[in-house]
């Protein structure tokens, strides 16, 4: 799968760049108002009681700010954050080393927590519940169990697939919050904030145009801003105006709904080769040359969300809105 400009996941090089644009405190964080307001209450209450914050699970599509919120929680609590990911914790010893290095009150952030191996996850249960670590020393008949006390800490887990979490792990989180896609006006604010940090001149009309094509996702909005800046510096006078933004986005093959060439390829395959559907997932994967899992987990969610695609018991169907967006007539059935 090629790296897509409109992918919600971080692309190569962005992990080092994104921290410069991230807000540090809740009052700087744009959008997700309900989540933000609730977190503010929970954080203030924990500080008043001089306790650690309950464990927090953040879930939702990629690129919406889960990692940013984890860092904000640590900043608001006045503690350090240690960050890792589910796939990085391959053995129980990997997690044990992290847990024993924490200081009282620290935030441990585990991204992609649904990908924790089961053996590692089981070590996490007593750590979350009782702030202790059960380890086995020795092998065979001489093996014995030791219990190590851990400092109180807050686990912040992030996942794009909350349903993939086991019930025992999910039940140990005191705070569970879903992050939603952003509104266009919120994304425009995020773009204007990033532009100010990066010393980019952009007018409000251009910011709104980028926001409309950012698929409700701040990471994509910031990525489009940086790419359009290149066009402004080379093809213009450095300022991002509406005409320049439109031209740059068209050259980048990001249309007015935020669809790229792969989205178009998928919709056109359903319409032109299967008369609009229904078509099975495996068949569609073979036709466009992608894995079925990639289509289902990466390409389809946004098309479903904006009403261009439907999943039916018989397969995928292109909606009348998809025909209209592509400038095609809906066939009479």
Swiss-Prot record:
Keyword Nucleotide-binding assigned: yes
Positions contributing to Mg(2+) binding: 67
EC number: 3.6.4.-
GO CC list: cytoplasm; Holliday junction resolvase complex
Annotated ATP binding sites: 21-22, 63, 66-68, 129-131, 172, 182, 219
Chain intervals for the UniProt region annotation (Small ATPAse domain (RuvB-S)): 183-253
Record function comment: The RuvA-RuvB-RuvC complex processes Holliday junction (HJ) DNA during genetic recombination and DNA repair, while the RuvA-RuvB complex plays an important role in the rescue of blocked DNA replication forks via replication fork reversal (RFR). RuvA specifically binds to HJ cruciform DNA, conferring on it an open structure. The RuvB hexamer acts as an ATP-dependent pump, pulling dsDNA into and through the RuvAB complex. RuvB forms 2 homohexamers on either side of HJ DNA bound by 1 or 2 RuvA tetramers; 4 subunits per hexamer contact DNA at a time.
Protein name: Holliday junction branch migration complex subunit RuvB
Organism: Geobacillus thermodenitrificans (strain NG80-2)
Record gene name: ruvB
């Amino acid at each position: 799968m090629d790296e897509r400009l409109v992918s919600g996941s971080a692309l190569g090089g962005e992990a080092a760049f994104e921290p410069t644009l991230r807000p540090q405190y809740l009052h700087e964080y744009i959008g997700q108002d309900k989540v933000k307001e609730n977190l503010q209450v929970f954080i203030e209450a924990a500080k008043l009681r001089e306790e650690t914050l309950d464990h927090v699970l953040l879930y939702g599509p990629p690129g919406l700010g889960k990692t940013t919120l984890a860092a904000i929680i640590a900043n608001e609590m006045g503690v350090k954050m240690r960050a890792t990911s589910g796939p990085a914790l391959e053995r129980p010893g990997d997690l044990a080393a992290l847990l024993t290095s924490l200081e009282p009150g620290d935030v441990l952030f585990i991204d992609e927590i649904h990908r924790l191996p089961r053996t590692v996850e089981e070590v996490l249960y007593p750590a979350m519940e009782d702030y202790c670590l059960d380890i086995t020393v020795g092998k065979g008949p001489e093996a014995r169990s030791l219990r190590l006390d851990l400092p109180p800490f807050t686990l912040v887990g992030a996942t794009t697939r909350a349903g993939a979490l086991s019930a025992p792990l999910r039940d140990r989180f005191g705070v569970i919050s879903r992050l939603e896609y952003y509104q266009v006006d919120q994304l425009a604010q995020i773009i204007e904030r990033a532009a100010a940090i990066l010393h980019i001149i952009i007018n409000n009309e251009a910011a709104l145009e980028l926001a409309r094509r950012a698929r409700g996702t701040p990471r994509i909005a910031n990525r489009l801003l940086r790419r359009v800046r290149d066009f402004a510096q080379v093809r213009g006078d450095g300022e991002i105006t509406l005409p320049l933004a439109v031209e740059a986005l068209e050259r980048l093959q990001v249309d007015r709904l935020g669809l790229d060439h792969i989205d178009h390829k998928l919709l056109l395959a359903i319409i032109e080769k299967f008369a609009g559907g229904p078509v099975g997932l495996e068949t569609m994967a073979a036709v466009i040359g992608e894995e079925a899992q990639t289509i289902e987990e990466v390409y389809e969610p946004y098309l479903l969300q904006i009403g261009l695609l439907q999943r039916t018991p018989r397969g995928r169907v292109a909606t009348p809105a998809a025909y209209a967006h592509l400038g095609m007539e809906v066939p009479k059935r």
